[in-house]
Amino acid sequence: MIVDAQSVKNTDSAEQKGYDAGKKVSGIKRHIAVDTQGLPHAIAVTTANVTDRDGALAALDRCKANLERVESVLVDGGYTGQPFADGVMERIDATVQVVKRNELHAFVVLPRRWIVERSFAWLEKCRRLWKNCERKLNTSLQMVHLAFLRLLLRRS
């Protein structure tokens, strides 16, 4: 399983928003846990001021019954720390593997991390998800679910 978060800007009509100081985005964050095919197994939408670690744990909490067979979770450098690893172990009994970025500051495709980035790119094909125009976080979450359902229906 591969976990990542995406910050999305808000429109003026959105009620719930936070500020992600790392990416300088005022809006929401989408936390997604995908399998090796890029299909989502856990999704959470939070305000942007929620850390990646807390949002990922919230996503895993929502779908813990479906994640019984997961053995390891691949994450990027934003998820380092023993409390996150302990939280994953407690929730789904899986180990955490942190994929470190290249220190040379050159663009390098991180192994197996591109899968979750591709899933975010699939979401960006839905024009409604380019920005968060929903008033409630739950509505944004349901729009992400609908986008992935549309993708799955087209593939079958």
Question: Where in this protein do the model-derived segments appear?
Answer:
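Basic, amphipathic alpha-helical segments enriched in Lys/Arg and hydrophobic/aromatic residues
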Residues: 86-87, 91-93, 106-156
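Polybasic low-complexity intrinsically disordered regions
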Residues: 1-93, 97, 101, 147-148
